[in-house]
Amino acid sequence: MSNKSNESSKSSKSSKLSKLSEGEEKKMDDEPPIALNLGCGKNILPSEQGWINVDGMKNDGVDVVFDLDDCRTSPLPFDDDSVSVVLLSHVMEHLHHTLPLMDEVYRVCKSDAKIIIRTPHGASDDAWEDPTHLRGYFPSSFEYFSQPMYWRADYGYKGDFKSEVVNLYIENKVLKDDTNEEIIRKVMHERNWVSEMEAVLSCIKPARKADKQLRSVPRLQILKRGPDLNPEGQNGIGAQGKQMKEVRNDSKDNVVELVD
């Protein structure tokens, strides 16, 4: 067979593969987005909405049994760039190996995928009274899942998530006649004011450089909740309470300003 015939054969084969690839991509675009409920425990979310419930224990409703602390040696059982939403609700504070997990979450997430992380506030008793809690989290903790934060230290972490907003929840029963400024001061400096945090992160691909100048600070929102404000309790993802006041963290030195 001549070189010309070989080239023609290769071109034809390449064209068929290209068409097949385009068809597969279209099929993938038509499929519902994948959403991972990692460390779901008993908080099972509906599969008809695209949720895959993952936990280290095989309980009712768990779709995939996987120990998240195994991410140092075993990959999450999902394809690269396949996931649109990840929920980690009261999981992170229980883990020994946080960065390996976030590396794996980064691998499986599409660009601009949303990651919702809920934890107790590090300055609350809820963060430490449970003997299975290994570490406390604060509003700035989620910035360590971004590459720009590693401008002065390299821990081998390769993922890059931008911390967009951190919701700080206050129970309505603790509020009295405090002014807005007093509430903000107490939230930022006193114990047991914030009962829970909810961070919303975006997956950045390709990853940014480990450059201090690229660091961004999340927007902070203070919200109140209680039986009279949120009778249905937690359900899926998203805000769980009624907004009380919003604060903005515009400085890279973590200065908080009141937004009217």
Regions found by a protein language model. Name each.
Residues 99-100, 110, 114-260:
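S-adenosyl-L-methionine-dependent methyltransferase catalytic module, highlighting the catalytic core
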Residues 2-5, 10, 16-75, 216-260:
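Conserved N-terminal segment of class I S-adenosyl-L-methionine
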Residues 33-123:
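Conserved SAM-binding loop
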Residues 14-17, 85, 122, 181:
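General secondary-structure edge motif
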Residues 21-23, 30-35, 85, 112, ...:
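A generic short-segment signal for beta-strand/edge and adjacent turn/coil regions
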